[in-house]
Amino acid sequence: MIKVTFIGAGSTVFMKNILTDILLEKNFSNCEIVLQDIDDRRLKTSNLVAEKVAKSIGANPKIIIEKNQKKALSGADFVILMFQIGGYE
């Protein structure tokens, strides 16, 4: 099974857009998706969004949330890095 890891998946909108493109590709519709972020709240939100995206396009990925970056990266075939610039006062 192909494993795609999103580092910084708390960037929900960016994650949603990239995930949608990935899951629309037939070879990835049943892959393992690992969402990793250090922020629990944002990670849970991204997980809900990812599940809704998958359901809406008829994909059936295995979606895993993980705070530990090393675990998230273990065995990954593809890694997508996301981060938000700014946000600090």
Model segments located where?
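Metallocofactor- and cofactor-centric catalytic cores in central/energy metabolism, strongly enriched
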Residues: 1-89
